[in-house]
Amino acid sequence: MDLKNKKYIKGANPYMPLWEHVPDGEPRVFTYNGETRVYVYGSHDTLRTEYCGLDQVVWSAPVSDLTDWRYDGVCFHSMDGEPLYAPDVVQKGDTFYMYAAPDRGSKVVVAKSKNPAGPFEDPVETELGFDPGILVDDDGRVYAYWGFTSAYCAELNDDMATIKPGTLREHIIPHCERGGGWWEAEEEHADKVFSFFEASSLRKIGGKYIYIYSRRQCEAVPEEGLPADSNGYLAYAYSDEPLGGWVYGGIISNNAGELIECADGTKKRAYPTGNNHGSIIEVNGQWYVFYHRMTGTDEFARQAMLDLIDVAVDGSGRVYIGRIEYNEAGEPVSSAETEMTSQGAHIGGLDSRALISAGYACCLTSETEGTTPFAESSAGAYIKPVYEGAESSPIVRIKSGTTAGFRYIDLGTESPKEIYMKLDDAVSGGRVSVRLDSADGECIAAVTTEQGKSGYTAALECEVTGKHALYFRFEHDDKTVDICGFDFFTFE
């Protein structure tokens, strides 16, 4: 297969380049110099041995195309040589305010700019705490939300930094039940429903205040395929007022991926889970959830993700966010977490004739291991973090029983005839089968690996058109050997 005229897919999921690591993303729509764009503000996982980094960067995309992301540069630098944790940015009047969290989030400062891409300057220390989320209401009043294991909120004074007297509220929603060894949670305001952990983010939709946050499930949930101490959930609550009256809504998304039923009847998730932080945004009538996922063998190389969601309010005022079911009258009746995909804003699926990096896999499992907090606690495969301009991030440590899945691929109106896979550092005797729609689906192509060979072409065994999930299943008679690294694939 001739690859020289093929280009790598851009703006898939993760939607930033695969070498970029911006977790905790807060998406905002701002108009500047006559152009309306989506701006994302997050942490910056550049230290590689701990969370976050010493600068924060801005990426933006035109509202007409959320696959076309532009690097707008560094917007804020560490003030003290310590990592900057999750920020937020809002606009009031002609000024943009960044709420940055220096010294690993131990304090919050507010800095200003006339440009949504920054730089944000003249930082002033605020009275806020960990993981600030800011809401500028329709009447111009400003509210702040923050907290780690306990949730707080308050109205801000006109200085955008200090709390208006008498407005501070504590324990505004119940938090998760217990500590995990390195943190403690008091018991009086805990429950298993709201289960607030961190990552406050506020939106106002149709007169409703929406509180988005990271939810921690301290006990294992076998029916959801999740281990104890899972905090990959983004959950939401809603209210008719900004400082109280919150009603639990449900789960918007989970960075552990799809739910899989195993042969023995147990369930597991399709992707190594870890912490989560994000929010929702409407762009040209379509709602999206922004969040992050893990790569590597720890939580220090996270990547920015987005997926489609619906948002609706029924006649009683109940808010639904995620994958919504409607009755025959078109009224919302239930919602569930949205799926985690490889396509992101490529709504029709990733172009099968382009080069598709294995780093876009949204499913990465083995036969024997269930969902793990992240890959260091297993012997399983993982997406290798890349930095400094690499166009592809490979899957490595692939052993027999590994499955890598991609939701979704556009195979076109005319079936391709063959598939090419780049499989580095291969050993002899590995078997790779390409399966349609599920890990146990119809096999449409297969190759056998050879020592020292990296490029493999296989004819398709049947005609396939349209949009499908694809799963690559790796097998070998020796269950202990690393079969290969998986770099990219393409069809022709």
Where do the protein language model's features map onto the residues?
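Carbohydrate-active catalytic/glycan-binding domains of CAZyme proteins
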Residues: 1-492
